[in-house]
């Protein structure tokens, strides 16, 4: 594992200069700061930054790392953590990862340097090994929406596979014979689990798996539009789709409307997450509820309990998805 001396050697500066960069000293020139930060990133240097932060903890602050604050899913997550923080007379600091390992690492390290004693981290790009290292180093860190082996008691997760299984099975029971799946093109565990749930339901009901009925794109409105266009181009018999999330479902519905394909009388669709948009689409979207508000509340309480013995540790649970029936599904 890299040390501060390794960073100094690679950057061709003194150990004291590296220390000043880590402490955001104004006495360091911008060029020197950039060279040192590049060396830190290249060596994946973390331990001393963590140790420095942990040596003088600030128990009044909870750090939150999310992927994108413009996404309603993460806005709900942050709001839930903030409510817990407020109830315990604390404040929150937010770091953003943008689906990039370097950004996630930088966000976590920055929050640690800001002396956050508790962290709620939503990480999709960092490896299990690196997150294990953080969990081993940072007593008050909790992972949300992911499970790290050996630290299951500090991870808050959802059974994603069960969610898409429920969605696909509903369409099967409504008589649909040709069901597609619109997934995320991000290489994350959520996508693997949700696709596996769709495939498992087809297999359990003896439905054939058609490769052309599975398409991946960016997990947003535009990605849903592009994915639906691809599906309509390759498959003329499709009557239903399970979408990775509500945003992709909304994009898909837009394409169906543009092609004069009525939802749900001609085509059924089920989303995932139950974000506010699901209630305002036309028709209102049948979806799988992801209880991120409850999960984030639990994660924040767990993170606080790990650093404050006066706060009772909540019981460990894996949250379950539920089917929310609205008006985007109809029998065949």
UniProtKB/Swiss-Prot annotation:
It comes from Haemophilus influenzae (strain ATCC 51907 / DSM 11121 / KW20 / Rd). Pathway: Carbohydrate metabolism; galactose metabolism [regulation]. It comes from the Bacteria. Transmembrane segments: none annotated. Gene3D superfamilies: 3.40.50.2300, lambda repressor-like DNA-binding domains. Residues 4-23 bind DNA. Repressor of the galactose operon. Binds galactose as an inducer. The keyword Nucleotide-binding does not apply. GO terms for molecular function: DNA-binding transcription factor activity; transcription cis-regulatory region binding. GO terms for biological process: galactose metabolic process; regulation of DNA-templated transcription. SUPFAM superfamilies: lambda repressor-like DNA-binding domains, Periplasmic binding protein-like I. This is HTH-type transcriptional regulator GalR. InterPro entries: HTH_LacI, LacI/GalR-like_sensor, Lambda_DNA-bd_dom_sf, Peripla_BP_I. Residues 1-56 form the HTH lacI-type domain. Pfam families: LacI, Peripla_BP_3. The gene is galR.
């Amino acid at each position: 594992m890299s040390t501060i001396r390794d960073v100094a050697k690679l950057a061709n500066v003194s150990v004291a200069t590296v220390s000043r960069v880590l402490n955001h000293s104004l006495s360091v020139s911008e060029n020197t700061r950039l060279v040192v930060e590049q060396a830190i990133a290249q060596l994946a240097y973390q331990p001393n930054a963590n140790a420095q932060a942990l040596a003088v903890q600030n128990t009044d602050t909870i750090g939150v790392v999310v992927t994108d604050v413009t996404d309603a899913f993460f806005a709900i997550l942050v709001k839930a953590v903030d409510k817990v923080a407020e109830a315990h007379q604390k404040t929150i600091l937010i770091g953003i990862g943008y689906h990039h390992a370097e950004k996630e690492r930088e966000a976590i390290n920055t929050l640690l340097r800001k002396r956050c004693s508790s962290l709620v981290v939503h990480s999709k790009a960092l490896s299990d090994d690196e997150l294990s290292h953080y969990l081993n180093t940072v007593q008050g860190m909790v992972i949300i929406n992911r499970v790290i082996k050996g630290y299951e008691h500090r991870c808050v997760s959802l059974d994603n596979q069960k969610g898409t299984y429920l969605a696909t099975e509903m369409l099967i029971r409504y008589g649909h014979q040709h069901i597609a799946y619109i997934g995320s093109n991000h290489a994350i565990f959520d996508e693997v689990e949700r696709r596996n749930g769709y495939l498992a339901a087809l297999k359990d009901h003896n439905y054939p798996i058609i490769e052309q009925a599975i398409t991946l794109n960016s997990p947003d409105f535009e990605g849903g539009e592009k994915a639906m266009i691809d599906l309509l181009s390759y498959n003329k018999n499709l009557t239903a789709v399970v979408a990775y999330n509500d945003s992709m479902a909304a994009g898909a519905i837009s394409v169906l409307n543009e092609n004069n394909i009525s939802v749900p009388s001609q085509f059924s669709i089920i989303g995932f997450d139950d974000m506010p948009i699901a209630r305002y689409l036309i028709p209102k979207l049948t979806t799988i509820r992801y209880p991120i508000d409850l999960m984030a509340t639990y994660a924040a309480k767990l993170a606080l309990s790990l650093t404050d013995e006066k706060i009772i540790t909540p019981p460990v649970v894996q949250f379950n998805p539920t089917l929310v029936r609205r008006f985007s599904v109809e029998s065949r």
